[in-house]
């Protein structure tokens, strides 16, 4: 095990590093959602993507990352396996920030059968492409400098330097690669907190696509299940009439202004809170107020 990894484990206050950028990712919203963490035993991200919320929160006794993208989940599997992670880390440390290397990985990654080599090539593509989207070209800089080097090179090296923290955070996380309907049924308990950040409703976005999209029927199935679960749930997405049934059944909502992707265009993201989540957060606030009043 690397000395760097041992240093990570000895930190009293850990800053978890997010290893990926992802279309529809919630890096900009993670700290806000972290404020809405209820008392819970099990945490489930139904549509993991880059898992920004998991990396923003403190570990729970039982945690689950789920996504239908099998290559994404294979990446997380390699990151949490000590033997595979050691080899993966060795390979990425030997990988230059190179257009030729990027194009070779982009053209051949799907032909690699060795799981670590496949994940290595997949990671190179996602970290060296613009906005982390492999259908885009290799990103390079002509003027932007960061840490005494091209900003794009700095970001690549930073993503490698953060891998030990990602390994440490994922060690005890369960990885699922299932339809969200199955995962809800499997993990729904009174003390489960579900975070659902599904692919945006198609009519609410101008561009971009996920590898695994959801049609309106899928969104309606998600809503039906959320209205019938025992656990608590926070749903995020762009405003859509499809999600109106949540509000009609007592779910609270909060509007958050955000910037869309790499543009400066302002969009409004909606957070929907299940009634039992709202109650749990109220109880948490009251408890903190009581503690504060005694000090």
List the predicted regions and their residue ranges.
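SAM-dependent nucleic-acid methyltransferase catalytic core
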Residues: 2-29, 36, 82-195, 199-207, ...
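Serine/threonine-rich low-complexity intrinsically disordered regions
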Residues: 81, 141, 274-278
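SAM cofactor-binding core of SAM-dependent methyltransferases
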Residues: 35-109
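Class I S-adenosyl-L-methionine
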Residues: 1-64, 68, 77, 164-167, 181-193, 200-295
């Amino acid at each position: 095990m690397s000395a760097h990894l041992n240093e990570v484990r000895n930190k009293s206050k850990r800053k978890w590093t997010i290893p990926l950028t992802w279309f529809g990712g919630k890096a900009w919203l993670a700290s806000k959602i972290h404020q809405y963490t209820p008392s819970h035993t099990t945490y489930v991200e139904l549509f993991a993507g880059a898992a920004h919320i998991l990396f923003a929160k403190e570990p729970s006794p039982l945690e689950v990352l789920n996504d239908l993208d099998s290559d994404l989940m294979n990446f997380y599997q390699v990151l949490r396996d000590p033997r595979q992670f050691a080899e993966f880390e060795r390979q990425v440390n030997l990988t230059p920030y190179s257009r030729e290397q990027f194009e070779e990985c982009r053209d051949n990654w799907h032909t690699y059968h060795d799981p670590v080599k496949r994940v290595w090539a997949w990671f190179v593509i996602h970290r060296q492409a613009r906005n982390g989207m492999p259908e885009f070209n290799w990103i390079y800089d002509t003027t932007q400098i960061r840490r005494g080097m091209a900003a794009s090179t700095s970001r690549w090296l930073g993503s490698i330097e953060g891998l030990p923290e990602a390994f440490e955070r994922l060690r005890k996380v369960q990885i699922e690669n299932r339809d969200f309907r199955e995962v809800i049924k499997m993990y729904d308990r009174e003390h489960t907190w579900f975070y659902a950040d599904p692919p945006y409703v198609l009519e609410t976005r101008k561009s971009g696509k996920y590898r695994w999209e959801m049609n309106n029927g899928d969104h309606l199935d998600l809503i039906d299940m959320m209205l019938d679960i025992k656990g608590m749930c926070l749903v995020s997405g762009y405003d859509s009439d499809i999600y109106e049934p949540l509000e009609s059944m007592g779910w609270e909502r909060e509007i958050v202004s955000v910037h869309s992707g790499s543009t400066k265009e302002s969009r409004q993201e909606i957070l929907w809170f299940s009634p039992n989540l709202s109650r749990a957060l109220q109880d948490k606030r009251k408890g903190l107020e009581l503690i504060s009043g005694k000090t």
